[in-house]
């Protein structure tokens, strides 16, 4: 990176990564109060599932830099698939471990959707920068994942206390998003028509599931109790 962009860019990248890692660490430590099971029993450790979710959080800025800073030849595309894709797969692994081996915690239920939101936003931006997805699809993915994160504080300020967990359609949309991004990565890798393939596979899968996810979120908010 230093050879391509200069030492100044490398220094800024290191600083940005360090600041981000500090912010993630503070968030994880601050969330220790939520280390309890959904039925209220205290948990004395973060556990592997929460650790894997945290790892995705730590990886966001390095992966974003990997996608947006040009590298020689097809190196950026190759690293994006190897590193970005591998970290993204942790989303499936942490849930499986939590359900099978535990611990399932309130912290994990809150962190996992938030971690997904961060990582898929990074994935959308990096994929667009690398020519893996068209702009409209990147915007759709960013809106789908950033929207609930941005709206959650507003909902809480109204006094509503909805459960901060996935919706069924949100899980389905996340699965489809991962499949679409992988398919388009392969198309881009072999020089195929990314725009055409995106229209064929993303429109009928991501658009309706994203809309149904937001409908489910609004219904959850409307049915949620008020604080106090």
Go through the PLM ranges and name each one.
Residues 91, 112:
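Conserved G/P- and acidic residue-centered "switch" motifs that form tight phosphate/ATP-binding loops
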Residues 103-109:
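Amphipathic cytosolic juxtamembrane alpha-helices at the membrane-cytosol interface
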Residues 41-83:
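Hydrophobic alpha-helical segments and helix pairs
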Residues 82-90, 143-146:
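Hydrophobic transmembrane alpha-helices
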Residues 1-53, 57, 113-228:
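A feature for the membrane-embedded catalytic helix bundles of lipid/isoprenoid biosynthetic enzymes
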Residues 95-103:
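Membrane-interface helix/loop boundary segments of multi-pass membrane proteins
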Residues 65-68, 85, 89, 128-129, ...:
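Hydrophobic membrane-targeting signal helices
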Residues 73-79, 107, 132-136, 193-194:
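Membrane-helix interface segments
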């Amino acid at each position: 990176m230093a050879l391509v962009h200069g030492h100044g860019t490398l220094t800024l990248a290191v600083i940005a990564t360090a600041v981000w890692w500090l912010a993630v660490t503070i968030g994880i430590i601050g969330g220790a109060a939520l280390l309890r099971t959904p039925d209220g029993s205290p948990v004395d450790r973060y556990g592997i599932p929460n650790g894997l979710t945290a790892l995705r959080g730590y990886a966001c800025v390095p992966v974003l830099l990997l996608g947006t800073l040009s590298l020689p030849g097809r190196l950026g595309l190759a690293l994006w698939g190897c590193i970005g894709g591998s970290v993204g797969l942790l989303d499936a692994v942490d849930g499986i471990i939590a359900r099978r081996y535990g611990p399932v915690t309130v912290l994990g239920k809150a962190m996992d959707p938030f971690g997904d939101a961060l990582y898929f936003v990074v994935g959308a931006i990096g994929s667009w920068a690398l020519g893996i997805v068209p702009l409209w699809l990147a915007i759709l993915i960013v809106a789908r994942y950033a929207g609930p994160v941005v709206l959650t504080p507003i909902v809480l300020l109204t006094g509503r206390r909805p459960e901060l967990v996935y919706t069924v359609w949100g899980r389905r949309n996340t699965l489809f998003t991962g499949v679409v991004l992988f398919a388009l990565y392969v198309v881009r890798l072999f020089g195929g028509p990314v725009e055409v393939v995106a229209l064929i596979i993303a429109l009928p899968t991501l658009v309706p599931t994203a809309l149904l996810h937001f409908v489910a979120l609004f219904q959850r908010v409307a049915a949620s109790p008020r604080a106090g």
